[in-house]
């Protein structure tokens, strides 16, 4: 079945997609803003492929939901579903550089060997106290509470440290009914609280002077360059859709400065 979508705000409807409640929460919380479709080429709104073997083919679907509104350059969500063992919710909220705001990032991935769960308000300028002073004192208590209820995901690479906050929520879970319960009863409310905090920060953010806005832009460029260069989904997407489509998707949709 080919999924047709009119624009980037068309509903995400993937059968048995574990992250549907998270998508619904996102749309509900963003309803307080006057959101508009973010321009996304039709080739990236919906893409399908068949992988696996001839005896056991697997249908893979990738859908993109994207919006823009006041203070936000882009909200984009990459949604992937492939059989029983592949399910992806990859969300990035990219603020305009006219405001001292972090990125909002959520990357929830289900693979055959388990769930990888990452959630953060990611700084554009981690070492800049002005950029972080209104965020971290409110974010860290949320992190400490929810991380105490989740197993740690382990160390993050040194090169990635500048792009994560002390409030980085990071966990790995095996595929099990217990993990499904953890996702619905712990991860989902954690996602809601992180997103609510981000929305509060949006409401109070004030426009910056030009010099400061340019400094934020440089930090955003470094972040986007790192994310686009190191995107762990690149190999998987290349396997499904080919290198040309994948590189265009990464640079024109997922991480577009």
UniProtKB/Swiss-Prot annotation:
> Into which EC class is this enzyme placed?
oxidoreductase
Q: Where is the signal peptide?
A: none
Q: Which Pfam families match?
A: Fe_bilin_red (PF05996)
Q: Name one GO biological process term.
A: phytochromobilin biosynthetic process
State a single Gene Ontology molecular function: cobalt ion binding
Q: What is its EC number?
A: 1.3.7.3
Oxidoreductase listed as a keyword: yes
**What is catalysed by this protein?**
(3Z)-phycoerythrobilin + oxidized 2[4Fe-4S]-[ferredoxin] = 15,16-dihydrobiliverdin + reduced 2[4Fe-4S]-[ferredoxin] + 2 H(+)
The UniProt keywords, alphabetically, are:
Oxidoreductase
Functional summary from the UniProt entry: Catalyzes the two-electron reduction of the C2 and C3(1) diene system of 15,16-dihydrobiliverdin.
Q: Which family does it belong to?
A: Belongs to the HY2 family.
Which protein, by its recorded name, is this?
Phycoerythrobilin:ferredoxin oxidoreductase
Question: Organism, per UniProt?
Answer: Prochlorococcus marinus (strain SARG / CCMP1375 / SS120)
Q: Which gene does this sequence derive from?
A: pebB
């Amino acid at each position: 079945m080919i999924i047709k979508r009119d624009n980037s705000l068309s509903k995400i409807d993937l059968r048995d997609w574990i992250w549907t409640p998270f998508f619904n929460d996102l749309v509900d919380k963003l309803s307080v803003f006057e959101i508009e479709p973010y321009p996304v080429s039709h080739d990236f709104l919906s893409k399908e492929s068949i992988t696996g073997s001839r005896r056991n083919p697997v249908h893979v679907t990738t859908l993109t939901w994207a919006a823009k509104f006041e203070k936000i350059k882009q909200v984009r969500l990459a949604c992937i579903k492939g059989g029983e063992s592949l399910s992806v919710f990859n969300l990035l909220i990219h603020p305009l550089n006219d405001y001292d705001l972090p990125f909002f990032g959520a990357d929830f991935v289900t693979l055959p060997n388990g769930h990888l769960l990452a959630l953060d308000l990611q700084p554009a300028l981690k070492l800049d106290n002005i950029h972080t002073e209104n965020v971290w004192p409110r974010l860290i208590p949320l992190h400490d509470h929810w991380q105490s209820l989740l197993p740690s995901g382990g160390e993050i690479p040194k090169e990635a440290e500048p792009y994560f906050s002390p409030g980085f929520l990071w966990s790995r879970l095996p595929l099990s009914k217990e993990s499904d319960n953890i996702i619905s009863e712990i991860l989902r409310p954690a996602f809601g609280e992180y997103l609510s905090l981000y929305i509060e920060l949006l409401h109070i953010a004030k426009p910056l002077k030009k010099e400061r806005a340019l400094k934020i832009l440089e930090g955003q460029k470094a972040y986007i360059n790192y994310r686009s260069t190191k995107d762990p989904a690149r190999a998987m997407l290349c396997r499904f859709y080919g290198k040309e489509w994948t590189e265009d998707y990464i640079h024109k949709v997922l991480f577009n400065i």
